[in-house]
Amino acid sequence: MTRSSSVLKRELFAGNEVTIRNADFMLRTAIYPGSFDPVTNGHIDIIERGFKLFDRIIVAILHNPAKKYLFSVDERMTLLRESLKKYPDIEIEAFDGLLVDYAVQKNAQAILRGMRAVSDFEYEFQMALMNRRLNRNVQTVFLMTGLRWIFTSSSIIKEAACFGGNINGMVPPAVNQKLKEKFGR
Ligand code: COA
């Protein structure tokens, strides 16, 4: 799916097709930040749904100081690129610093996050409030995770893969392959 930079989309207004161009209004840009260690189908689901709400999505690999990573930033970036190759307009970047600073640098109005079970709520609430305190102009938008992905996470998938568990359908094929290589299977 591509979005031309001049013609953004065609929509129906009062039954007539209207062409909306970039210059007609400000692009609604969202950053979808995360560790993506590695990207899972749960993340892809949020990205695909977010892309229906925003004109521009930037998937940003950021550093969470509380985590130890299995994949390097370069590996995570390559896996994201491969997994999102049918969406060439979705940007993928890495950033080392404050998320809200990055959002400002990218002219993004929103931070997109997926919300899984109730257990996510406290952490996400804390992070959203802190980000708002740091910059009131950047809004956090939550999408409810698809039911299929409600109990998945990168860690649980890595653990299953490490012990030879079948993770088909939970991660994009490139990630499945890379996990097999990492764990020597
Ligand atoms: N489906 C399935 N799993 C999902 C998911 C979905 N839709 N959305 C998130 N997850 C999982 C991830 O796989 C991840 O699992 P893991 O903990 O087992 O790795 C977990 O939910 C949350 O990870 P993620 O969304 O990648 O966030 P994070 O906590 O790793 O990273 C940052 C949070 C990077 C966005 C945050 O630390 C940050 O903003 N860092 C920059 C510094 C900064 O600005 N800090 C101040 C913020 S207050």
Question: What is each residue range found by the language model?
Answer:
Residues 1-25:
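N-terminal amphipathic/basic-hydrophobic helices that include classical n-h-c signal peptides
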Residues 19-185:
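Nucleotidyltransferase catalytic core that binds NTPs
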